[in-house]
Amino acid sequence: GYVSNILHDRIEIGDTIEVAPPCGEFFLDVSEKHDRPLVLLAAGVGITPINSILLTSLDAFPERDIILVHAVLNEDVQAFRSSFDALAQKNKNLKVYYRYSETPFISATNASNGFVTAEYLESILPGRDADYYFCGPQPFMVALYHGLMQWGIPASQVHFEFFGPRQELERAA
């Protein structure tokens, strides 16, 4: 991104830089009690903050049911797959699914071709009442936000990281 390019292009070893703590609002609040399942949805590099939320939840709420869906072009560009598979083996309350938009061959039983849509989620979720966290490219975000709003999911159960003003996402949906 913008800051990464500046760091690589202008900062030298030994330089001092001033940083501030993270200012984001996309995190799992571990001070609250969580009775509903946690649904984590990511496309592409949107998996990075979702991975952090997953690890936080497994640590803070080891009995909570978690469904993780990661959408990417194909298996070759999928980050964290071996980690997610290992976590699912270790945590029976964690279900992991992969969606590939460009792969004709899929080697895993928990993987399928297509996009992450409300219809797809309906086929894998035990029910709609859950806490939803999602991050990814704009078309992914718009489709999920629109689908969750159509389902009548309360805003308090919908959490996302959108790279742009929230109003843009709401207008697009």
Predicted regions and their residues:
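Short, flexible coil/linker segments at domain boundaries that flank nucleotide/cofactor-interacting
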Residues: 33, 61-63, 126-127
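Short amphipathic alpha-helical leader/targeting segments
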Residues: 28-29, 60, 150, 172
